């Protein structure tokens, strides 16, 4: 144990930079990222990359249509090939480009052969995970041409995990394997693939859609870096999705608990497990924009003063409900306890849940991406095998902030806005950090915009009144502007 600690201490000055697919979508983006790495990193730092642009989606479509529509599959195949080759040709010198094209075409031939096999976990993961390999190899070659000593590394060489709905990294095995590469390339920037790991059989394991952030924090925790910066196409974390809400504003500081809850609620800006690997460490986490590095950022702070204030409105239009309706003779509390133990053991907690003791009903809300896999796992529990079903076409809208559920003003405003919406149920977190509504619709854009407008205007007045310390003025504003919500 002491040896491991000593090894980690040697790498404490290291930083890790993670770049998402939107930061690597075209030639200009790759050059921009190379400049950021040159300016913001030093020898020995780690760079984790996602697949370029929409490569992962293209690979999924290629695989999908290879079995049902060969003409369409051929179009996806050609699109992937030309996109990757175009990046290589335009970013590298002729000699280096020819070499990387050979590597790419060798990979591509391998994937074409795999498409002739039955599609199982092994084949699917091997094909879909290749975007990260191409991205890391190319990024490392670009850095070399920038005069930056670099080495690309396939994360499957050291990250170990087994197939499941939420693959968990074997930290002990992974740390031991990673150590030799850190020693070997201690004076280089290591460009590492995100999203992929390997199991004991040597098969590729995917760490979940948008799992590169999770890869980054996991690798950062394994190496004991002192700071992780996640770069994307937005400046940081906003009060709402800035692509949906024009008035959303940047949050320069967010508490660890608030960020963790945002991730748990499957917000697009944070992968659901991004914060897990670093929750018990002192690693700093920051979010910045690769398109405009100096515009601003969001820092995740371990301790922030609690003020029962709203920070974020988040939504997800692709969630499902797993429903378990027990028979009259079944002991509801006993079954519910067994389900909870199962979910805890497998770390597959729902986004929200509803328990109706009278109707012996349990509803568990998950993203569409993982719902089918979790339902399959739950159906293995013998006592609920015949009682379980899946309903889709739901959405989730939530407000997040430390102690938000104890602030009656925000709660009432939230409930009032949802009074005419098809609400399936409301739920709030145990720590009172989020209030959630699950809706039987998948169109929440207008609702989110209106909620943001009202809640953050209310926040503005709330802060103004506290500054003035005038209760009369405060309640006057509430009565005149928000009489509907009180």
State where each predicted segment sits.
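Structural beta-strand/beta-sheet cores of well-ordered domains, especially the beta-sheet scaffolds
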Residues: 15, 188, 226-227, 260, ...
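Hydrophobic beta-strand scaffold residues
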Residues: 150, 190-191, 285, 350, ...
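Electropositive, surface-exposed helix/loop patches at the edges of structured domains
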Residues: 183-199, 262-287, 326-329, 388-401, ...
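A conserved active-site cap/scaffold subdomain adjacent to cofactor or substrate pockets
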Residues: 256-301, 306-328
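A conserved regulatory-domain signal marking ACT and ACT-like small-molecule sensing domains
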Residues: 298-486
């Amino acid at each position: 144990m002491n040896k491991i600690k000593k090894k980690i201490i040697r790498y404490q000055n290291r930083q890790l930079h993670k770049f998402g697919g939107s930061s690597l979508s075209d030639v200009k983006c790759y050059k921009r990222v190379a400049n950021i790495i040159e300016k913001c990193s030093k020898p020995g730092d780690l760079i984790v990359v996602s697949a370029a642009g929409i490569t992962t989606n293209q690979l999924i479509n290629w695989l999908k249509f290879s079995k049902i529509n060969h003409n369409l599959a051929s179009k996806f195949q050609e699109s992937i090939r030309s996109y990757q080759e175009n990046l290589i040709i335009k970013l590298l010198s002729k000699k280096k480009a020819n070499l990387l094209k050979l590597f790419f075409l060798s990979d591509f031939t391998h994937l074409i052969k795999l498409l002739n096999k039955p599609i199982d976990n092994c084949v699917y993961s091997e094909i879909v995970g290749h975007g990260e390999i191409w991205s890391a190899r190319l990024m490392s070659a670009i850095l070399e041409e920038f005069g930056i000593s670099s080495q690309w590394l396939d994360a499957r060489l050291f990250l170990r995990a087994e197939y499941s709905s939420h693959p968990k990294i074997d930290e002990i095995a992974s740390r031991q394997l990673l150590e030799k590469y850190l020693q070997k390339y201690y004076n280089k920037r290591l460009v590492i693939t995100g999203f992929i790991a390997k199991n004991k059989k040597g098969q590729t394991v995917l760490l979940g859609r948008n799992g590169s952030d999770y890869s980054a924090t996991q690798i950062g925790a394994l190496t004991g870096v002192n700071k992780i910066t996640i770069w994307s196409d937005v400046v940081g974390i906003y009060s709402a999705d800035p692509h949906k809400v024009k008035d959303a504003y940047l949050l320069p500081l967010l508490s660890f608990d608030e960020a963790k809850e945002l991730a748990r609620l499957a917000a697009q800006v944070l992968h659901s497990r991004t914060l897990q690997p670093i929750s018990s460490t002192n690693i700093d986490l920051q979010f910045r924009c690769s398109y405009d590095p100096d515009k601003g950022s969001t820092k995740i702070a371990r301790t922030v003063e609690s003020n029962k204030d709203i920070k974020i409105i988040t939504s997800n239009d692709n969630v499902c409900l797993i429903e378990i309706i027990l028979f009259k003779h079944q002991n509801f509390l006993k079954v519910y306890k067994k389900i909870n133990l199962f979910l805890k053991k497998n770390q597959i907690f729902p986004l929200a849940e509803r328990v109706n003791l009278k109707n012996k009903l349990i509803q568990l809300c998950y993203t569409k991406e993982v719902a089918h896999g979790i339902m399959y796992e739950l159906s293995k529990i013998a006592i609920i095998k015949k009682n379980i079903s899946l309903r889709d076409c739901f959405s989730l809208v939530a407000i997040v902030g430390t102690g938000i559920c104890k602030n009656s003003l925000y709660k009432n405003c939230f409930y009032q806005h949802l009074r005419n919406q098809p609400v399936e149920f409301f739920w709030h977190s145990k720590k009172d950090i989020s209030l959630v509504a699950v809706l039987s619709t998948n169109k929440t854009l207008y609702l989110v915009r209106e909620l943001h407008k009202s809640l953050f205007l209310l926040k503005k007045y709330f802060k103004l009144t506290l500054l003035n310390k005038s209760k009369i003025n405060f309640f006057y504003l509430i009565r005149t502007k928000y009489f509907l919500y009180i």
